[in-house]
Amino acid sequence: MSDGQILHGSHNGVEVLCYRGDVRHTLCLALDRYLQQRLRRSDIRGFVVDLTGARSIDSTNLGILARLARAMQKAALPQVTLISNQPDINELLEAVGFDQVFNIVEALDTRLDKVAEIPSLESEGPATSRLLLEAHRALMSLNEANRTRFRDVVQAFEDELKP
């Protein structure tokens, strides 16, 4: 079990995600489903992701955020804003190239009247493996350094999914 959690809320069509604790791949399936559901809505005006409460974020969840950035760009919607005031997380975001595809700020008022947790889902075998693969491919697509950094991880997932 992960001690991380992702809370969500919205304000005037802007979806807000608040990451807390150690955000690991155990949350990725639920987060991806939530994001896919939200991105199908016609009234979405943007996304803000508050990372100030996160202790750590694994590469799978970073990859899901990269997919979100790409989806917003394809839909001609505003760039996703990441809020991060932690040097370690800021260094990680820059290392994977998020400064090129996200608006990263140290502070922003994200007070919401109502928030709810995105509950984790049980692993669904191949579906989870495919999501892990897609998330890491999204990271690889950001820059050459990521292509090198995640090549072996992607290859391992591809091998696992071969019939």
Predicted feature descriptions by range:
Residues 1-53, 70-163:
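STAS-like cytosolic regulatory interaction modules
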